[in-house]
Each structure stands twice: as structure tokens, then as C-alpha cells.
Amino acid sequence: MQSLTPQDPRAIGAYRLLGRVGAGGMGQVYLARSDRGRTVAIKLVRGELAEQQEFRDRFRHEVRAARQVGSAWTAPVLDADTEAAVPWVATGYVAGPSLQATVTGPRTPVGVASGAYGPLPERSVHILGSGLTHALQAIHSAGLVHRDLKPSNILLTIDGPRVIDFGIARALHTVSDGGVTRTGALVGSPGFMSPEQVRGERVTPACDVFCLGSVLAYASTGRLPFGTSDSGAHAQMFRIAQEDPDLTGVPVGLVELISDCLRKDPAARPTTDELLERLADSDTAEPWLPGALIAQLGRHAVELLDSEDPEDPEDYPIAPAQTAQTAPVPDPTPPTPPSPTTAATAATAAPTHVPAPAPGYGYPQQPYQPQQHQHQQPGFGPTPPYGPAYP
């Protein structure tokens, strides 16, 4: 985790910022904590995007839909202000490294991993697939298609995987960096896109099933089933659309399932219900990850608890807010077994005092009026969170 800079706000909404955990096409992501101790990840939209009405409309719609996703397999959207001068959204902060960092490299949202573990054992991949399928079911039930399911958007915890950045990244779909609307724009990561995404066709939940197949092949082997982009992204996308996947090294027990997910025809791919039947695993008594990874996750949790509050925020800026969009979300129903162990998390209240914006920060120079936030109180809570990846 990086320290806050003098240009960063020290509070957003009801949350005090602790540090930077990354940045992406949509904006900066911060680790934050409420006055009652709940840790969240807050994504603050880039200023130039906040000025585009088309983006704001899509962002508002996607956040509203994403708030309806209730699953123990996702990092839930907890709070948001889509009407602020600079919109933001807060999600659960998941205590675990990304699948990408675990399998092939030390890069994690907070940069604390000392190295990669390598490909996961077959049983771990089997349970990973089950958890991800549960997450996709919840996302699809809310009327969303993730469209960017990839290893950096999957976080590993002691009691199962968590999917992050569902739905919200779609707000960038028709908005380019220059503010020009672009039709048929590609959304996704080249190595983990579906053929219909590559061709610019309409995407459906079957798109996420294809991406799931690519993710499981990667988790099993440490390699992408359609090769890397070393020869160019266009060559890689051609292979996705036209060639068979390379499943060398995938355990025999997973080859057929992954092959079915990677069918070119969306209609020929299994549904999430069919996948759950094939991924059913009654052996849940033992930890789902190897011992070395379990130990690493424990260290991550300790580091999160040891996080200290930053310096006094009184002399630093705060991201301006207007009308908070924080309608409570009904308690979700946890997934059917195998499901992770979850714990209820308490609702947090808005602070009684928030510092005024500092001159020169680049936001409107107006007094800050604290908003009354109604925080959801889900009936579950993923392990106290640790770092979403970013679209």
C-alpha cells in the first residue's frame, strides 16, 4: 500500500483514507476505514470522466445494479455517491492476494506478496471454479455481465475466492479517454476475452462462462489458453476467435469442463447451473488452498490489522459529495454448499465532522456538507477485505 500524497483527499464520504492501493482506467482506489472500524476499498472516479454526463449516467446505472448483487463470493458494493462532483463507490476490501499474483507473480493490489506460488492443485482449481460460478450466478441474477473476469479481478481468501469489479467497469464502455463516444469499443482484457467480445458482438452471461474457462486453465497451468500478447494483441484475439485452446498441462479431470466453457459458440457453452452440478465437491473439511498459501493469507490479515491511520486530515482535501446514493440492499441469501464461512458485519454511521476541502485541490471551492449515509448491513461479509484489482 502506498502512502497518501498531499494531493489526495483524506476522507471520502463517511470514510477516512489510509492509503493508495492502485489505479485504473476509471480512477484511483484507496484503502479506507469508517469511524466504527469497517475497512473498505473506495474507487474515486477520474475528474475528466466525472465531467462527462454520458459516463455519469452509466456509472449511476451500473452502481445501482451492482448494489443488488448479494453473494458470499463477491466483494459487495457497500456505499456510493454517484451524484457527487467527483463520484465514488465503496466495496468490501478482501483480505487476500489476486489469483494473478498467486500463480505467476508478486504483483498484488497492495504489493505485499513476496513471490508467486505457481499453478494451483487440481482440487483447489475445482473449488475455485465452484466459487467463481456461484459469483457469476449472483452477478447475472442482478442483470449484469462481468465481461472482465480475469485473474487480477479474483482475490483468494481462506474460505474461498471473491470476484471484484463486477458491472461497474461497464460505465467506461462508451467513453474514451478523450471524452469521445465510441461505438463497438472492446471491453475486457485480451487474454481473457470471449470470441463475441473480440468480434464486437452483443455479450451475454455465456461470455463470462468463456472467461471462466480461460481463468481455470490459467490457474491450472500458469499459462493463457490462447497464448500471450507478445506477438501482438490482435494476434492473440485472432486465436481466441478462430483457434482451439492449448490445454497442455491441465489436469485430466478438468480438461473436458474447461474445453466446454471455451466453445466458440456461446449457445454451446454450459450454463452456470450445469457448471455447478459438474463442480459439486463434497470434500469441504480440508482447507481449499495449499498450506503455504494459507500461511501467506494469515500474514496478509495481520498486516491489514496493523495498518495505522494516516496523519491528521484536518489540513488536507476531501472529495466533495452531494446526494449520497446509499439505499440499503436486502440481505442476500448465501450460496448453497460448498460455501465459505462468513460473518455478519455491522453497519457504519456517517461521521459527525468532515474537514473542508483545501484550496488548490482542483475541486469546487465550496463548504462541505456532511451527508447522512445509510449503510447496508449484509447478512454476510467476506473476510475483511484486501484490495480490489481495477478495470
Q: Which residues fall in each region the model found?
A:
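Eukaryotic protein kinase
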Residues: 1-313
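Regulatory extensions appended to serine/threonine kinase catalytic cores
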Residues: 286-390
